[in-house]
A protein has these predicted regions:
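Hydrophobic ligand-binding cavity/cleft-lining segments
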Residues: 1-54, 175-177
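A conserved amphipathic terminal alpha-helix motif
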Residues: 2, 98, 119, 125-177
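Short, P/G- and charge-enriched loop/turn segments at secondary-structure junctions
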Residues: 7-11, 62-63, 95-98
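Hydrophobic small-molecule pocket/channel-lining residues, especially in calycin-type beta-barrels
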Residues: 24, 37, 57, 75-78, ...
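Hydrophobic pocket/interface hotspot
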Residues: 32-39, 62, 76, 92, ...
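Hydrophobic-ligand binding "helix-grip"
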Residues: 44-45, 53, 67-119, 125, ...
């Protein structure tokens, strides 16, 4: 794989190639967050997702193979589970790739509570190579179609995700009151 220049969240807004998509999901922010850990379950072109070391958390690394686009090593730059307000975020930068289309790339998934579920905002930002610039119109169309396909898949999985709930049982070793 070819190393990519490191990107940070604040640079996502300034890259030459930027794609955004938003949609409503009838699921909880916690459920969506859980499913974002393994995009091979819901993203149609991702054929594998392998974590190196711990799963999740800022600095953790995973490798995904995306059919037609190549293999990407991703480093998490934001890993924010749903808090009291219900908002959550996952963002990562690609540090290595086999793709001839990009020289720098990052993605950001923002999950915000909305009536009856959540709003998912997906931003993909990249510095494209010469080949990537030629392919940009087709890339945008492909990304738009992929979002249309993966959004309902992600929604279905997130709606049935096992979300940890506070227990009403006393903790082991804790006397019941």
């Amino acid at each position: 794989m070819v190393p990519l220049s490191l990107d940070e969240r604040r640079q996502i807004q300034a890259t030459p190639f930027r794609f955004t998509a938003s949609g409503h999901l009838n699921a909880s922010a916690a459920g969506v967050f859980i499913e974002l850990a393994d995009p091979s379950r819901w993203f149609p072109l991702i054929t594998s997702c392998l974590w190196h070391g711990r799963v999740g958390g800022v600095g953790s690394v995973r490798e995904v193979h995306v059919r037609l686009f190549g293999t990407f090593r991703e480093t998490m730059i934001a890993w924010e589970p749903a808090g009291p307000g219900g908002t959550a975020r996952v963002a990562f930068t690609m540090t290595e790739t086999t793709s001839p289309l990009v020289s720098c790339m990052a993605e950001d998934f923002a999950i915000t509570p909305a009536l009856g579920g959540v709003r998912l905002d997906w931003t993909l930002a990249a510095v494209t190579t010469a080949l990537g610039r030629l392919a940009a119109p087709a890339l945008r169309q492909t990304l738009r179609r992929m979002f249309a396909v993966y959004r309902p898949r992600l929604e279905r999985l997130a709606a049935s995700a096992p979300v940890a709930r506070p227990s009403t049982e006393p903790a082991r070793g804790t006397p019941a009151s």
